[in-house]
Amino acid sequence: MQVLVRDNNVDQALKALKKKMQREGVFREMKLRRHFEKPSEKRAREAAEAVRRARKMERKRLEREGF
């Protein structure tokens, strides 16, 4: 991952790098890899995430349609 530093503004470059890493899911991946996750736990977590995503999409769809 690469970020340009303009006018020696390192703080702005760090902020941009952190934003890019957040979008890419690097922090989330690091958090998940800190400890071993059993395959059954992984399946359960992914299923729960899918349910959460589906509910969120349904809420947004209903909000868009005006219900």
UniProtKB/Swiss-Prot annotation:
Gene3D superfamilies: Ribosomal protein S8. Keywords: Ribonucleoprotein, Ribosomal protein. One of its GO terms (molecular function) is structural constituent of ribosome. Pfam families: Ribosomal_S21 (PF01165). InterPro entries: Ribosomal_bS21, Ribosomal_bS21_CS, Ribosomal_bS21_sf. One of its GO terms (biological process) is translation. GO terms for cellular component: ribonucleoprotein complex; ribosome. PROSITE patterns: RIBOSOMAL_S21 (PS01181). PANTHER family: MITOCHONDRIAL 28S RIBOSOMAL PROTEIN S21 (PTHR21109), SMALL RIBOSOMAL SUBUNIT PROTEIN BS21M (PTHR21109:SF0). Belongs to the bacterial ribosomal protein bS21 family. This is Small ribosomal subunit protein bS21. It comes from Gluconobacter oxydans (strain 621H) (Gluconobacter suboxydans).
